[in-house]
Amino acid sequence: MALPGERFHVLAQLEHLQSKYTGTAMRHEPSRMDCESAPRHSRLSNVSSRNEHVYCRCGEREPSSNPLQSDKSHDSAVWTASREESS
């Protein structure tokens, strides 16, 4: 049987992994993230540490320190198209 301390450590690891994977899921599905529901561009630690964009439905994004990455954002075309339709 595991000691109480060990059990807590395992739970902490599990929580860390869970938040890590839910973070990556949000990153790859920008359309699920809503401006109103999410705190002003919610900052996930694993996202910001890898210089990746956190997209929001309104089309705003966190600036990346990597210029190559910001130029090759395939998602920007989706937002410009949807903005033209609405006007």
Swiss-Prot record:
Composition bias type Basic and acidic residues, residue spans: 26-39, 50-63
Protein origin, superkingdom: Eukaryota
Chain intervals for the UniProt region annotation (Disordered): 23-87
Record protein name field: Protein moa-2
Record organism: Caenorhabditis elegans
